[in-house]
Amino acid sequence: RISLLDSNGKKTRFLFQVKTALRLDNMLVHHARVESFRPPAPYDAVLSRAFASLADMVAGCRQLLAPRGCFLAMKGAYPAQEIAQLAPVYTVAAVHELSIPDLDEQRRLVELVIRNSGEAP
């Protein structure tokens, strides 16, 4: 299952139309702010598209992630300063360079994991 979350009603209405038109039965669309959203079960992965710094993202989304899950963050240039500001419990598992056709800009996918799921960041 894939859950999509956005606080913008116009975006969630569009996503719901896409879900319906393409008959994507494994997709759920949620209209809510991440800070107040509580899923019925934690997710194996949480993907964010440039809505905050890495530190703010993991702090705001921690309640969504399963103990052995990973955060995936879409970024532009290599976020060295943001990585340095992460709490020590987070490890950068990988930084993937992305190539997007017809886009002459840097894009990266940062993969973060929690070192010890028993520790609270």
Predicted segments, located by residue:
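Conserved SAM-binding strand-loop segment of SAM-dependent methyltransferases
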Residues: 23-34
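A short acidic, Gly/Pro-enriched loop at the edge of an enzyme's catalytic core
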Residues: 35-45
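Short alpha-helix immediately C-terminal to the canonical SAM-binding loop
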Residues: 11-13, 79
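Active-site capping/gating segments
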Residues: 77-121
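A short glycine-rich, Lys/Arg-flanked "PGG" loop and its adjoining helix->strand segment in the class I
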Residues: 55-70
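Residues lining the SAM
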Residues: 48-49
